[in-house]
């Protein structure tokens, strides 16, 4: 029985399959993951420490020379996501009012499209990308929260730049970079461990998803996810390539962060007049989180295969 080969037939399978299994268990038998001990620590609450270990391992593969390019890619993709989200969201708000179109409000669009799932990004660039793509997460982590969304809605005065959150993401990467650049043997040792961690933190991420939210969000929520991955992804990929990337990082960032579901609450607290719209946006964003967790690996895998074919043709030309 070749389980590994079967999983790898699915685009981004080492990320997607464990994530879906975790979500299914959390939806239908959540108590199975809450028995305590090592089981709960690993399968339910393990995402953050496992991603931290993953970033350290992958950071070991980043050379000091590659760091500026990684920062450029991360900054460009982050800015592109923000501008595209603002453009589409405020366009819908202007043309169709606060209620939006097809059930999609400007608040929901901006909150979903201006965020990205850091864990999903890390897994995908770890599998398909290069050291610069991995390093870009240090900047991309800035869009993992309500800050940019609130800027877009004119409520920037109610938010602060999460500097310590950025530092917290950087520390494992920097520790890995230091070890990898000081000792080539440590680089080889650590970088081999990165891919091993992907299915474990993918399962833990899935264990935080309840598939009932997909039903609550309905077709509008699924449409929001499609918009985030494919329309937003088109611009992210172009922006990534514009600054010398392969497009893989841009594709991998075309998702909605899990904590984006809490963004409408932050918006409602900043502007109580948006409370009703914000409440309606939450299930839509939750549906987008689930939809993009499935679609973004498909897009990233397609971009990676296309890039590999082009590289092969150029090599043989």
From Swiss-Prot:
Pfam families: KdgT. It is found in: Cell inner membrane. Disulfide bonds: none annotated. The chain crosses the membrane at residues 10-30, 47-67, 82-102, 106-126, 134-154, 159-179, 195-215, 217-237, 248-268, 279-299. The gene is kdgT1. Belongs to the KdgT transporter family. It is a multi-pass membrane protein. Keywords: Cell inner membrane, Cell membrane, Membrane, Sugar transport, Symport, Transmembrane, Transmembrane helix, Transport. It comes from the Bacteria. GO terms for molecular function: 2-keto-3-deoxygluconate:proton symporter activity. GO terms for cellular component: plasma membrane. It comes from Salmonella typhimurium (strain LT2 / SGSC1412 / ATCC 700720). Catalyzes the proton-dependent uptake of 2-keto-3-deoxygluconate (KDG) into the cell. This is 2-keto-3-deoxygluconate permease 1. HAMAP family: KdgT. It catalyses: 2-dehydro-3-deoxy-D-gluconate(in) + H(+)(in) = 2-dehydro-3-deoxy-D-gluconate(out) + H(+)(out).
